Each structure stands twice: as C-alpha cells, then as structure tokens.
Amino acid sequence: MSRCVNIDWLEVYACESNMNYPMNADYFRNHGYVVHEREYGTRVYSEMFTVEDQHGHAFIEVRRNPQSGSSSFTGLSELSCHLRLVNRACYANNPVRDMAEFMVKHDYIFQRIFRLDLCYDFIRFDSGDDPARFLRRYIENKFSKVNQCKVRVIGDDSWASFDWESVSWGAPTSMVGTKMYNKTKELKATGDKKPWIKQAWFESGLVDDPLNLPDVWRIEFSMHSSARNW
C-alpha cells in the first residue's frame, strides 16, 4: 500500500556570522538573489524577507534584526535570526540538505531546530480500515489514545451528513503536537494553492491522477520549542 512521507515545515534558529553581518535583504541582493521584502517584521524580529532559488521560486524565509528590547526576554543577540524553508521547498527531494547547503554557503551558525513538522499521507490504514470511519469510532470512544490527553476535533455539519474532518492531540504549548485530518478536503477548501503536495502524492504512487483525488488523510507530528530549550 503506497504512502507518502514528507517534511511540511522546517525552521531553525541560527546566528549570522560576524564577517557577513548584517545579512539583510541587500546582502542577498548583492549576492545575486531575488529578494521579496515585507514592509513589516514580526513581534520579535524587525526584518522579514524571502529569498528565491535559481528557478525563481520562493525558497528561504529570513527573519532577523531582533526588535529593541526583545533580547531581554528571549535570549537573542543582534546576530540572532530564524530561517524557514517555504512550504514548496519542503517537498523537494532533500529539503534538509538544501537548508544546510544554504546555511553553509552564507556562514550561518546553526543553533538548534525551532520547528519541524513531519507528515504521513495515506488513503487507508494497513489493516484496510477507512480513516473517516476510524475517526468516527475514536470520537465515539471505541478507541483510546495513550498520552496527549488534550483533544480538539473539527467536523462538517450539513443537511445531508455530519462528518468529522480532523482531530488534534496535545496542548498548544506542548513540544509535540499530533493531528489527523483529511488533507484532500483542506487543499480544496484553501483553493488548491499547494500543487506540489498533490505532485508529491503522484510521484510516490499514492494517487494515480493529481487532478482527480481520492480522500487522502494526513497524520502530522509538529515538534517545536523556544530557541532556548531545543
């Protein structure tokens, strides 16, 4: 039975090298990259921009230049930054290598992983059980899950039927969260803005036609931590 396993989010906490500092948007433009700069930053970083790859696709999102006073409660320095692979780049053949090569090329100093999402996409369980029916039985308390006692469920209530579409385990503050949901429905609901996911399903043999999809379900493990604790 075909499966498709991918990274869906890869973000690291790093430091810029003293030799290249400041590694702002102009630094990358001067090195021949196309850069898309956001007019505003984040709560922690005052600068945020996206660097394109050699094919003209968004590749790495950079957040840098900690806001004044942010170091006092986050342990950041003026060299601190976050690097995140954009979602499309996560579905490349070797996203970890791509991130590592980018960091080495520009002398970033790796500190730790900030967030990593691993996803497992499938149509049926190995036993042949239908995921939607399994989820319904779980919510009806026919099964119990060990650990991660915090549970959130989402369903679709219509005149014709009521279907459970997702269940999440773990508190929002947990280092590890688990979610099982209908990925096909999510893609359709968001306007099919991520064709690379359907392409990954096709290339792995999970689906026969990326334009005519069955219900593909996803089990996703999201691991994250503050920059100081992981």
Regions found by a protein language model. Name each.
Residues M1-W230:
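Structured, helix-rich domain cores that form ligand/interaction pockets
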